[in-house]
Amino acid sequence: MSLLTEVETYVLSIVPSGPLKAEIAQRLEDVFAGKNTDLEALMEWLKTRPILSPLTKGILGFVFTLTVPSERGLQRRRFVQNALNGNGDPNNMDRAVKLYRKLKREITFHGAKEVALSYSTGALASCMGLIYNRMGTVTTEVAFGLVCATCEQIADSQHRSHRQMVTTTNPLIRHENRMVLASHTAKAMEQMAGSSEQAAERMEVASQARQMVQAMRTIGTHPSSSAGLKDDLLENLQAYQKRMGVQMQRFK
């Protein structure tokens, strides 16, 4: 799983199901693909979204700011700063500074995530705030590790509140990952279209998959409901590749 796919998975796992989730998924996909480069408009859109908690907006704002190239002097947004202040608790700020010092020594996404997971959500948010306010700098990869650790903690608490049995991999994250991977597989199918006779058939399969993912995000589904989705998609893609004599290795 690529780094950006992992980030997309974790961030979407904390967004409540509904039409807005499908919209945010599309925005993230566009941002990570370099298709959306207007950070100012993106932040204005995010600020006015209903339903999302201030912290979720703050995390999304942080991710957009990390990913979208922007002018050096672009002003930081108050709604993100307020969300990432650790509820104004000085203890959170103290812990955030300690965490930041540890993160400065990390160079990998997974290393940063591992270190961050031992801190509270408030301390993690405060640490993001430090970086967002340019009071500290880490590599983008390390910052994404911090983001995913925060999302995992939030998803864990949401999962516990659903009174479902906690397994080693959080079902909300696993469910979201299936949908993100299914969506990416559909995109890969579309990119391979060309002008062959089978192109229309494959575009149809990809389109159906996209619609299914969007519907699942919009109406909300149980985490186990996406289990067969990715496998069905991969099967369709591999069957198509086999007919076309294309190497299948890349999409396994």
From Swiss-Prot:
Gene that produces this protein: M
Origin species: Influenza A virus (strain A/Swine/Hong Kong/127/1982 H3N2)
Protein name (Swiss-Prot/TrEMBL): Matrix protein 1
Major location category of this protein: virion
UniProt keyword annotation of Ion transport present: no
Region called RNP-binding, residue ranges: 165-252
Primary role: Plays critical roles in virus replication, from virus entry and uncoating to assembly and budding of the virus particle. M1 binding to ribonucleocapsids (RNPs) in nucleus seems to inhibit viral transcription. Interaction of viral NEP with M1-RNP is thought to promote nuclear export of the complex, which is targeted to the virion assembly site at the apical plasma membrane in polarized epithelial cells. Interactions with NA and HA may bring M1, a non-raft-associated protein, into lipid rafts. Forms a continuous shell on the inner side of the lipid bilayer in virion, where it binds the RNP. Determines the virion's shape: spherical or filamentous. Clinical isolates of influenza are characterized by the presence of significant proportion of filamentous virions, whereas after multiple passage on eggs or cell culture, virions have only spherical morphology. Filamentous virions are thought to be important to infect neighboring cells, and spherical virions more suited to spread through aerosol between hosts organisms.
Location in the cell: Virion membrane; Host nucleus
Subunit structure: Homodimer and homomultimer. Interacts with NEP. Binds ribonucleocapsid by both interacting with genomic RNA and NP protein. May interact with HA and NA. Cannot bind NP without genomic RNA.
